[in-house]
């Protein structure tokens, strides 16, 4: 399972011209579920995201988590994070889980974020073509994998 985490001032997801989710200060997560992933990977990553200290404290030092600052999370499923580009020029997505497996794990990941104390967890539309807009804060972008 792979998560690309971006600290944002705001972010939103639009599907077919309609905004389906938006957040203020917090994290935009692009989440890729692999064929071999399970609840252990999803749970570990959710706790890591909730606990990662990447927000500034009173001195400006990265010392606070999204949970500490009461930030929001916008999680977007993105199977292309599992692309294999080692051979040829067309990415292979063989390592990505099929939708029947990926969607429940994505939902489990989001539920575990809530259980870990993240005040607001919103999502895009699983499997849809989405327009994702964001205002980076920093920028701070981190890739997490388990």
UniProtKB/Swiss-Prot annotation:
One of its GO terms (biological process) is D-amino acid catabolic process. Signal peptide: none annotated. GO terms for cellular component: cytoplasm. It catalyses: glycyl-tRNA(Ala) + H2O = tRNA(Ala) + glycine + H(+); a D-aminoacyl-tRNA + H2O = a tRNA + a D-alpha-amino acid + H(+). It is an enzyme of class 3 (hydrolase). Keywords: Cytoplasm, Hydrolase, RNA-binding, tRNA-binding. The keyword Hydrolase applies. Its EC number is 3.1.1.96. It is found in: Cytoplasm. Its main location: cytoplasm. GO terms for molecular function: D-tyrosyl-tRNA(Tyr) deacylase activity; Gly-tRNA(Ala) deacylase activity; Ser(Gly)-tRNA(Ala) hydrolase activity; tRNA binding. A motif (Gly-cisPro motif, important for rejection of L-amino acids) lies at residues 138-139. Belongs to the DTD family. Homodimer. An aminoacyl-tRNA editing enzyme that deacylates mischarged D-aminoacyl-tRNAs. Also deacylates mischarged glycyl-tRNA(Ala), protecting cells against glycine mischarging by AlaRS. Acts via tRNA-based rather than protein-based catalysis; rejects L-amino acids rather than detecting D-amino acids in the active site. By recycling D-aminoacyl-tRNA to D-amino acids and free tRNA molecules, this enzyme counteracts the toxicity associated with the formation of D-aminoacyl-tRNA entities in vivo and helps enforce protein L-homochirality. A Gly-cisPro motif from one monomer fits into the active site of the other monomer to allow specific chiral rejection of L-amino acids. NCBIfam families: D-aminoacyl-tRNA deacylase (TIGR00256). This is D-aminoacyl-tRNA deacylase. It comes from Rubrobacter xylanophilus (strain DSM 9941 / JCM 11954 / NBRC 16129 / PRD-1).
